[in-house]
Amino acid sequence: MYEILIIGAGPAGLTAAWEANKHGLKTLILEGDKEVGGISRTVERNGWRFDIGGHRFFTKVDEVYEIWDEILDKEDFLLRPRMSRIYYKNKFYDYPLKASNALLNLGIIEAIRCVLSYFYVRVRPPKNQDNFENWVAARFGWRLYNIFFKTYTEKVWGVDATTIGADWASQRIKNLSLMKAILNAFQINKSGEIITTLIDKFKYPKYGPGMMWETAYKKLLEQGHEIHLSSRVSEISKHDDHYLVTTQEGEIYKVKNILSSMPLAHLPKTIKPEPTSIVKTSGNNLKFRDFLSVALVINEEDAFPDNWIYIHEPGVKVGRVQNYGSWSPYMVKEGKTCLGLEYFVNIGDELWSMDDENLISLATEELEKLSLIKKNSTLEGYVVRMPKAYPVYDLNYSENISNIEDWLTSEHSNIYPIGRNGMHRYNNQDHSMMTAVKSIRNIVLGETNDIWKINVEEDYHEEISTGRSAPVQK
């Protein structure tokens, strides 16, 4: 019987095995895909390397840094400058949003309208602030909301912003408001102290985040862990003192503890005996947003300096543009660069179903329309599709998660959901890793860490213009 079985070989799953190894335990990992890393993997095509979404290696948690440094050697890391901007109506805006830059770019008339709109909502705030639209409008005013938040947010989620829970806004921008942004522009906080930006540089593996998890995979195998790729779990059946885990390939494993990074929505369908109808319905109601990236090889050495640009322009479908050469010069070839256009989609919709050739043509047309590249400078392109990339925070997601959490706590205390999809939480890479570390310590050391509290009650760096957050437990 295996002491610990881990479902998924992304950052959470591999970190769980890494932590278990420190306590003298070997694990079995079952990964449904043919490669490791999950959404943090790096794709290689014809000598070009590109991420599935960008992953800055920055955290406030020392343990996470220690794990990164244990997996990769010092010379495997680069220290890269951080730069991101918003593109809107042929102008670039600082990201995170800075009042001085935003109001200057908008022009004096529009700036006055935005400020007046902000003071209007201070007097007459939206009554119902449980959805994204009203929550943000109450803190920035309706005009700034419509300019900088509505279009991009609805691109990401594919639904009206009134159907997105306020949790999404509060998690990503926490207590920031227009007034705080203005104070930040002058580098002053409530106490009159100078605010400093916590991150203007970040660590990054030479060959992308996939380098981290590919190396972890190889080292774990050398340490004696079992890792089976293309091995998708189809059933978890509970017995007196153990579980039997069955894969689609017909393999059966007897295990004591399970760490699962499979989508939380799928867990109730997988476990036998079946849960109550409330739990099954809650799982069915958890939604995901899918994702595809079109990587274009451009016949220019430096298209722009940013790591990525958020596209708030309503006239194009692309949501964000990655500049892989800005992440690492080792990702691209000399004299050329590679840009990744990110599209937020649903499996089966028009974009997801479009063939690669047409997607490459669309991406090229949109980059040229935005004047981010010169015409006829695209040399080749590649498409990568990623299902279930983003857990959706709709108005009922929290209740659905609570129902599943309560069921697992009462009926399956030896099953530990970990990671972004495993917990249906929009976690950063470091948060996902910490859910794995804390779960292993609960098993091995008898600790009582509440995994569900990680990345819930915290002050986000976004509030002071860093765009990142750090996991804490309270």
Give residue spans per PLM region:
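Glycine-rich FAD pyrophosphate-binding loop
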Residues: 21-45
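N-terminal Rossmann-like FAD-binding beta1-loop-alpha1 element of flavoenzymes
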Residues: 2-29
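A short alpha-helix-loop-beta-strand transition element characteristic
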Residues: 42, 64-87, 143-147, 288-289, ...
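C-terminal lid/capping helical subdomain adjacent to the catalytic/cofactor pocket in oxidative enzymes
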Residues: 395-474
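Active-site/ligand-binding neighborhood in enzyme catalytic cores
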Residues: 112-116, 120-236
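Flavin (FAD/FMN) cofactor-binding core of flavoprotein oxidoreductases
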Residues: 361-405, 416-417
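Mid-domain catalytic core of redox enzymes
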Residues: 23, 231-357, 361-372, 376, ...
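Dinucleotide-binding Rossmann-like beta1-alpha1 core, especially the glycine-rich loop
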Residues: 46-124
